[in-house]
Regions:
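Acetyl-CoA-dependent GNAT
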Residues: 1-64, 72-75, 130-131, 138
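Short, solvent-exposed loop/turn elements at beta->coil junctions and helix N-caps
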Residues: 24, 112-116
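Short aromatic/hydrophobic contact patches that present stacked aromatics
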Residues: 58-60, 88-90, 124
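Conserved acetyl-CoA-binding loop-helix of GNAT-fold acetyltransferases
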Residues: 61, 67-80, 100-104
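Conserved GNAT acetyl-CoA-binding A-motif
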Residues: 82-93
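C-terminal "cap" of GNAT-fold acetyltransferases
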Residues: 92-96, 115-139
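Conserved acetyl-CoA-binding loop of GNAT-fold acetyltransferases
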Residues: 103-111
């Protein structure tokens, strides 16, 4: 089940496995999609939508639920739910599985941010999506 109106406090159990620490800011632009199965949050996607641009802040799926298409579906939901021109994200160059997923979804590497992470460079990736929306309206 997809939950698009998520209260951050409902994610506390999944954060036990998740290693990043966030100070969640009350923002009109921050959106959270979670994926719930058997009353348990097993994945979440944090993203900002500002006008025609979207930035994926983070994606996390519990290990036992990975490689089941959950992250791909959440990213595609952003495309379906918001009329944005593009989506950007940042990923560690060491996270080969994530890079492969993003490339499979049509993201392109556009920049490298040296020493962005404590143990690696960051790769900035971009997916152009606006033309797909226009195609829907034209045909």
């Amino acid at each position: 089940m997809i939950n698009k109106n998520v209260d951050i406090s409902s994610l506390k159990d999944i954060f036990k496995e998740y290693q990043e620490n966030y100070s969640f800011v009350d923002s009109d632009f921050l959106k959270i999609y979670s994926y719930v199965t058997n009353d348990k949050v097993v994945a979440f996607l944090l993203f900002n939508v500002m006008y025609e641009k979207c930035e994926i802040v983070d994606i996390f799926v519990l290990k036992e639920y990975r490689n089941k298409g959950i992250a791909s579906k959440r990213i595609n939901e952003i495309i379906n739910d918001y009329a944005v021109d593009n989506i950007t994200l940042e990923v560690s160059m060491l996270n080969k599985n994530a890079i492969n997923l993003y490339e499979k979804l049509g993201f392109k590497k556009i920049a490298v941010r040296k020493n962005y992470y404590k143990d690696s460079d960051g790769i900035l990736m971009l997916k152009e999506v606006r033309w797909k929306l226009w195609k829907i309206f034209i045909y």
